[in-house]
Amino acid sequence: MNEIQQLGRRWAEAEQRGDVAALDAMTVGNFTLVGPLGFVLDKDQWLDRYRTGQLVTSSLVWDDVHVREYGDAAVAIGRHTQQATYRGQPSDGQFRATHVIVKVNGQWQLAGMQLSPIGQFRPPTAS
């Protein structure tokens, strides 16, 4: 497992624990999340969901990951399957997730993340 894959594993584990300190340490200052419904959160907004207890992730699996490196930057695309609640409401799902990762002072950190729901493919029908 390379450093980028290890970062992804540590990120998934930290989300499950709600470990704000670990998530803070593994992300750049201007980290941005684009959620599965198109909402955009900056780093503080993203971390506040855990700080306040609004988001509770009971299971997060990050698999089927493919990494492309570009010097001090990388893109990891994988499957993100979660069981979670947000403000007490179920927030389970399976998403295709894109992580943007950059090397800062010799350490890989998450700079951005985008989640897209994985749905069923429906071929077009003839008219």
Each predicted region: which residue ranges?
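A beta-strand edge to alpha-helix "cap/lid" segment located at domain peripheries
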Residues: 1-26, 30-127
